[in-house]
């Protein structure tokens, strides 16, 4: 039912836009593009909890993400996009389809581009572009669930001169999967700079994560996050570091009746080096303290390393090893994974 509703809504939205624009079938297709992106892997997972094998241990094939996007340009100022997101949900043991993007864009100038609807948020997609290996693993803040990549709201971005850019968003706070209305809006922003091959950025978030609703549970705490990134991106190699510090960054903490605060922080170091036009070595290491106040002994240490193969335009493969270890007093969860990851773009 949810899949049919999402797909039907997307189709109806584009049909209505087509009618409003008054464009002929030929001119409509001339100004419309369809794109796709798939992240998939075939791997073996060895997951243990306090020394005992646990799910999802085993060998298998996964499609982590499948995006289908439709872009239409009405004129030099206005355009629109609808992008669906296919993924597997372990909660219901089934696949689901969401609208990741559904927006109308107005480009007033390079310094001001406004989008209304669901679209990329300021931080995670920016870091993904710098990192370069999203199909292998999420970026630091996304992997640790203190940030997400898209949400519903009002978004603005632009370039300021030759070196600076910005992005800001006033959003519902529940993420793109849940467009529910809330009493107030959350806010996320980023200011970035690029000098030759050096990239620097700072960002932040504040809000109730979509939990502040009329007649709902009280939300005494406010989720906040501060982000920073510095990276060198050259012709053959790149190296960078990402950092975050977050307070009360979960729905449970925002609604905590005891008004108990919790803090988290972490960093990621990543890099890659292109050996030949086809093969590239890459890797990253992360360390996170996910609950510095309530569970100060808890620590998450993660790394991956691999070699990627650019098969042809739009198709890449990577042989990868991953290790993720979460420890606290008396407990240890370890996840080791090895396999082949792929990204397909068109």
Where are these regions (language model features)?
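Short hydrophobic/aromatic segments of transmembrane alpha-helices and their interfaces
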Residues: 7-8, 62, 147, 298-299
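Short histidine-centered beta-strand/loop micro-motifs
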Residues: 179-180, 337
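Interfacial loop-to-helix transition and helix-capping segments at the boundaries
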Residues: 180-184, 221-223
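Cleavable N-terminal export/targeting peptides
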Residues: 1-27
């Amino acid at each position: 039912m949810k899949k049919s509703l999402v797909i039907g809504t997307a189709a109806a939205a584009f049909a209505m836009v087509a009618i409003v624009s008054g464009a002929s079938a030929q001119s409509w297709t001339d100004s419309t593009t369809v794109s796709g992106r798939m992240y998939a892997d075939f791997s073996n997972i060895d997951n243990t909890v306090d020394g005992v094998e646990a799910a999802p241990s085993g060998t298998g094939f996964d499609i982590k993400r499948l995006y289908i996007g439709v872009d239409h340009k009405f004129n030099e100022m206005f355009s629109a996009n609808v992008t669906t997101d296919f993924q597997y949900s372990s909660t219901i043991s089934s696949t689901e389809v969401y609208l990741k993007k559904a927006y109308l864009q107005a480009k007033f100038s390079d310094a001001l581009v406004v989008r209304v609807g669901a679209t990329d948020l300021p931080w995670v997609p920016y870091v993904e572009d710098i990192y370069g290996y999203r199909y292998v693993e999420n970026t630091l803040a996304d992997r640790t669930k203190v940030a997400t990549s898209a949400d519903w709201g009002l978004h603005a971005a632009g370039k300021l001169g030759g070196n600076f850019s910005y992005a800001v968003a006033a959003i519902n706070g529940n993420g793109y999967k849940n467009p529910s209305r809330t009493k107030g809006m959350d806010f996320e922003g980023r200011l970035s700079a690029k000098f030759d091959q050096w990239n620097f950025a700072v960002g932040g978030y504040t809000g109730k994560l979509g939990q502040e609703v009329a007649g709902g549970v009280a939300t005494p705490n406010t989720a906040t996050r501060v982000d920073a990134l510095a990276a060198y991106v050259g012709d053959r190699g790149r190296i960078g570091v990402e950092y975050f510090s977050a307070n009360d960054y979960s729905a449970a903490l925002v609604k905590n009746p005891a008004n108990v605060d919790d803090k988290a922080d972490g960093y990621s170091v990543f890099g890659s080096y292109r050996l030949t036009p086809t093969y590239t070595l890459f890797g990253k290491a992360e360390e996170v303290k996910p609950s510095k106040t309530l569970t100060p002994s808890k620590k998450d240490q993660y790394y991956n390393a691999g070699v990627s193969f650019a098969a042809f335009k739009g198709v890449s493969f990577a042989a990868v090893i991953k290790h993720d270890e979460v420890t606290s007093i008396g407990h240890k969860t370890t996840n080791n994974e090895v396999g082949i990851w792929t990204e397909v773009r068109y």
